[in-house]
Amino acid sequence: MPSIYINIFLAFILALLGMLVYRSHLMSSLLCLEGMMLSLFVLITLTALNTHFTLSFMFPIILLVFAACEAAVGLALLVMVSNTYGMDYVQNLNLLQC
């Protein structure tokens, strides 16, 4: 396994650990999620370039579309929660609270 794949895998694991450690604030969770998406994008792009399979060139674009949608929904949720409660704690996202 080349060292670039190991570095990308370590970046993904580091973002995942950050997601687990800093899960109390929504902004920290969104930043870690974006780090995971970035490492997946680089990994899929390198894999598409190495396989030379024509259909695999659209997978990084599809991942970027999903990452942009996820970021837009996450930021809208962050704005809504911070305007409603005045803080960005993830525990405010519980739908069972009145």
Swiss-Prot record:
Class of the enzyme per the UniProt entry, highest EC level: translocase
Signal peptide: none
One Pfam short name: Oxidored_q2
Tagged with keyword NAD: yes
Reactions catalysed, as given in the entry: a ubiquinone + NADH + 5 H(+)(in) = a ubiquinol + NAD(+) + 4 H(+)(out)
Protein name, entry field: NADH-ubiquinone oxidoreductase chain 4L
InterPro entries: NADH_UbQ_OxRdtase_chain4L/K, NUOK/Mnh_C1-like
Molecular function per GO: NADH dehydrogenase (ubiquinone) activity
UniProt function note: Core subunit of the mitochondrial membrane respiratory chain NADH dehydrogenase (Complex I) which catalyzes electron transfer from NADH through the respiratory chain, using ubiquinone as an electron acceptor. Part of the enzyme membrane arm which is embedded in the lipid bilayer and involved in proton translocation.
Record family assignment: Belongs to the complex I subunit 4L family.
EC number: 7.1.1.2
Chief location bin: mitochondrion
Entry's localization field: Mitochondrion inner membrane
Mode of membrane association: Multi-pass membrane protein
Highest taxon above the source species: Eukaryota
GO biological process assignments: ATP synthesis coupled electron transport
Transmembrane stretches, start-end: 1-21, 29-49, 61-81
Any one cellular-component term (Gene Ontology): mitochondrial inner membrane
Assembly and interaction partners: Core subunit of respiratory chain NADH dehydrogenase (Complex I) which is composed of 45 different subunits.
Keyword list, A-Z: Electron transport, Membrane, Mitochondrion, Mitochondrion inner membrane, NAD, Respiratory chain, Translocase, Transmembrane, Transmembrane helix, Transport, Ubiquinone
